[in-house]
């Protein structure tokens, strides 16, 4: 999807709005697992700058942080999620900034300082700015694994169940560095979701047999600063008209 920080264009825009204030923000680092699902067939074509399986792609990304710090604030054992939907008949990358909505969910276990930290990280790592219709909510974010099936819930708002696929030569299929990759999606394992539900932002999702992804992550603020700077340079280069003799 649905990063979906979920996409390269998102970080181009993030880099464009980053200013002096961002330089003063505390450094951070987080490690853990990404759980993700969406309405597309597996594997989600949005990561390859192709149109979604359905007219639009609706999906989520949930980060379960095992270890993390934002300045002096510990983020161990907390979670953050993002749910988005793209407009019909456009790729996620083409339509970035015009998505139907982008809602951020903060773990209710977090205290005030942790919630602020999670919000700042979420707005950097996840595609929060993909839409003009945004909200930040606090909710319980949980997961469990039963018989190889991962079950993730964002309070009363939504849930999904997914299981990794088996590769033709054994093991689990892995996707490495797709066109839409960001540091969070440099490599991920491919699965299929038994169900994806969502009841917020005026939605009533109930998808079955769609895309599911799982990834380990280890991210830092310095990594994203470097990544965003590189994307900004690429963006500038594409806007520079060719010289003629």
Question: Where does each model-flagged region fall?
Answer:
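Positively charged n-region of N-terminal signal peptides that target proteins for export
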Residues: 1-6
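Bacterial N-terminal signal peptides
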Residues: 7-16
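Boundary at the C-terminal end of the N-terminal hydrophobic targeting segment
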Residues: 18-23
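Beta-strand-enriched cores of mature, soluble protein domains
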Residues: 25-245
């Amino acid at each position: 999807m649905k990063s979906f920080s979920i996409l390269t264009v998102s970080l181009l825009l993030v880099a464009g709005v980053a200013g002096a204030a961002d330089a003063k923000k505390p450094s951070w680092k987080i490690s853990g697992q990404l759980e993700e699902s969406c309405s597309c067939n597996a594997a989600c074509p949005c990561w390859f700058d192709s149109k979604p399986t359905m007219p639009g792609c609706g999906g989520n990304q949930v980060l379960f942080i095992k270890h993390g710090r934002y300045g002096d604030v510990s983020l161990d054992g907390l979670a953050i999620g993002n749910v988005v939907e793209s407009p019909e008949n456009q790729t996620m990358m083409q339509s970035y900034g015009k998505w139907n909505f982008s809602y951020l969910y903060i773990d209710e276990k977090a205290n005030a300082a942790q919630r602020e930290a999670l919000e700042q990280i979420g707005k950097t790592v996840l595609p929060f700015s993909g839409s003009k219709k945004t909200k930040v909510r606090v909710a319980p974010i949980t997961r469990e694994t039963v018989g190889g099936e991962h079950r993730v819930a964002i309070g009363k708002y939504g849930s999904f169940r997914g299981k990794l696929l088996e590769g033709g030569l054994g093991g689990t299929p892995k996707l490495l560095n797709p066109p839409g990759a960001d540091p969070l999606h440099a490599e991920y394992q491919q699965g299929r979701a038994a169900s994806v539900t969502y009841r917020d932002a005026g939605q009533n999702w109930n998808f079955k047999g769609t895309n599911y992804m799982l990834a380990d992550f280890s991210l830092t603020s310095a990594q994203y600063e470097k990544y965003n700077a590189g994307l900004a340079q690429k963006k500038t280069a594409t806007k520079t008209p060719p010289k003629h003799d």
